[in-house]
Structure formats: structure tokens, C-alpha cells
Curated annotation (Swiss-Prot):
Pfam families: TylF
Gene name linked to the record: mycF
Outcome of gene disruption: No production of mycinamicin II and accumulation of mycinamicin III.
MF terms in GO: magnesium ion binding; O-methyltransferase activity; small molecule binding
Function according to Swiss-Prot or TrEMBL: O-methyltransferase that catalyzes the conversion of mycinamicin III to mycinamicin IV in the biosynthesis of mycinamicin, a 16-membered macrolide antibiotic.
Xref: SUPFAM superfamilies: S-adenosyl-L-methionine-dependent methyltransferases
UniProt pathway: Antibiotic biosynthesis; mycinamicin biosynthesis
Protein name per UniProt: Mycinamicin III 3''-O-methyltransferase
Entry similarity comment: Belongs to the methyltransferase TylF/MycF family.
Organism, scientific name: Micromonospora griseorubida
Length: 254
């Protein structure tokens, strides 16, 4: 059924805009992608590297983010929204738009990123991260996006205000002292074992019961390893639900 209310129409259009289903920009050529073209199925599933769009997570994961935020609001789950790994900011822009659409004034969207792309590999990194060496993809898919650029993107949507706060830096440095108290939605998009584990270790304990943990890169073995290692260590048995071929989420029961 098509959207009908003003809120539904706004959020549907906002999703289409941050993912650029409107003007349908081509993808970067990288990895398994050999042609610079817009492919609707790939954009729907977040399986391309947009040249212009403000998010690469695709429509299915945007729908999931909307489901999680709206469910938290409906059920009165206390806390803010945090995304770790934001690229051009599109998913966080959409999250702020959801709060705006429902006139929610007591929650914050936290935008955490290095704003430098992936870090260089060091001797301290997990072996699976060293093998992937994600740093090599920074330029190929235009990953490094400055804080100023992300802030400007928020401003273009009319959504840069005091309910948006930025946490620039590597997660191992920013997460231990991040100033949020409670989270209703925790969206992790760091790709690597290290980034995922840093966020789970320091942010997941602040996720409220009934809140949502979203893992954008569960399809990546290093990320999946961190997720299961953390869940096993802390006895987390909440059902992992598949979003698409890449992402999953679960709802925290306790």
C-alpha cells in the first residue's frame, strides 16, 4: 500500500532522496562491480557504491532503520539513536527526519565516524582485519568524507540542529567516553572486527531493554566474528533477524 499521511509521504520521499532513487546516480566501479551504472536492485539492497547518494545502505536497510526507530518511539524505549560509521550521513539524516516527523524533541541522533575512511592496518589489528585491509578501498569508492561535508548534508535537508551531535574519531577512542546515557537504537556500520567490537564493548551496555542493535556488515566474516564473540561472551541469545543479504538486527530483551 502506498504512503498516505503527511508523515508517511515525507519519510518515503526522504528515503528515496538520501539513497538517490530520484536521480539514480551511477555506482563507483570497485570490487565485483564492473560497470558505472545505476542498477535498481543493487541500490535497493545496498550493494553498490553510489557516486552522489548520501547513503549506500539501500532501501531495505533504510526501511529497517525506520522500523526500529518507530518501534522504539511507539513502545517508549528510552534513549537516543547512534550510528557508528556514517559515510556521507544519509542514514543519520533519515533518523533525524523520523524524529522530526513525529515531533520528538527529547532524543538525539549521534553521528560517529572517523571522517577519514578506514584506518591503516597496524600490528595491533585483528588478523581478519589485516587480511581484508579495508584501507585500500578508501579512494576507490570515495569513502573519506569530512565532518564539514556531513554537517553540510544535514543542513541541506534542514535537519542540522541541536538534536544532532557528532563524535569524530576512531571508535576505540570515542566510544569509551561518548556522552550519551541510553540508546534506543544502535546501528553499527564499521565493517571490521575491531570497529564492531569497539562499539559493542562500549555502546551496547547502554542499549535499553527493548532497544535495537543493527549490524550493517554482518555479511563480512570479520564483523560477524566480532558479533558472535561478543554475544557468546555476554550470554546474548536474542534472535538475529536478517534484513537483506548484508545486514541483520536483534531486539535486546534484557
Amino acid at each position: 500500500m502506498s504512503p498516505s499521511t503527511g508523515v508517511e509521504l515525507y519519510l518515503d520521499l526522504l528515503k528515496r532522496t538520501v539513497s538517490n532513487f530520484i536521480y539514480q546516480d551511477a555506482t563507483h566501479v570497485a570490487g565485483l562491480i564492473t560497470e558505472a551504472a545505476f542498477v535498481e536492485e543493487a541500490r535497493e539492497s545496498g550493494e553498490d557504491y553510489p557516486t552522489v547518494a548520501h547513503t549506500m545502505i539501500g532501501m531495505k536497510r533504510l526501511n529497517n532503520l525506520q522500523h526500529c526507530v518507530e518501534s522504539a518511539l511507539r513502545d517508549g524505549v528510552p534513549g537516543d539513536v547512534l550510528e557508528t560509521g556514517v559515510w556521507r550521513g544519509g542514514a543519520c539524516i533519515f533518523a533525524r527526519g523520523i524524529l522530526k516527523a513525529y515531533d520528538v524533541r527529547d532524543r538525539t541522533v549521534w553521528v560517529a565516524d572517523s571522517f577519514q575512511g578506514f584506518p591503516k592496518i597496524t600490528d595491533d589489528d585483528h588478523p581478519m582485519d589485516a587480511e581484508m585491509n579495508l584501507h585500500q578501498y578508501n579512494e576507490a569508492v570515495d569513502l573519506p568524507t569530512s565532518l564539514a561535508t556531513v554537517q553540510r548534508n544535514f543542513s541541506r535537508y534542514g535537519l542540522l540542529d541541536d538534536q544532532v551531535r557528532f563524535l569524530p574519531g576512531w571508535f576505540k577512542d570515542t566510544m569509551p567516553t561518548a556522552p550519551f546515557e541510553r540508546l534506543a537504537v544502535l546501528r553499527m556500520d564499521g565493517d571490521s572486527y575491531g570497529a564492531t567490537m569497539d562499539v559493542l564493548t562500549h555502546a551496547y551496555p547502554r542499549l535499553s531493554p527493548g532497544g535495537f542493535a543493527i549490524i550493517d556488515d554482518y555479511c563480512i566474516p570479520a564483523c560477524r566474528e566480532a558479533v558472535h564473540e561478543y554475544r557468546d561472551r555476554h550470554g546474548i541469545s536474542d534472535e538475529i533477524v536478517e534484513i537483506d543479504r548484508q545486514g541483520v538486527y536483534w531486539r535486546r530483551s534484557a
